[in-house]
Amino acid sequence: MEYQYPLDLDWSNEEMVDVIAFFNKIENYYENSVNGQDLMNHYKRFKEIVPSKAEEKQLFKEFEEKSNYNSYKVVQEVKNNPELTSFSAK
């Protein structure tokens, strides 16, 4: 898809790359499938960069407005189903 990722210009280049990598995992969930542990590892790194719940909600909202992909729903599905390894919207 062609859209911009929600980024904070105060982040380092590495942090921006890591946040984009997390959102790429969300895209994979909707477009193909994603490994749950891999997604949670990326989410953990995302939370190191964005520890504020309010900022997380704002970034998730911005991403959903641009992509129609609900990051919160995906993270909750993976968290609530630790026995599964592969996740997909299909």
Curated annotation (Swiss-Prot):
Gene3D superfamilies associated with the record: BH2638-like
Stretch forming the signal peptide: none
Family the UniProt entry places it in: Belongs to the UPF0223 family.
Family matches, as NCBIfam families: PRK04387.1
Protein known as: UPF0223 protein SH1855
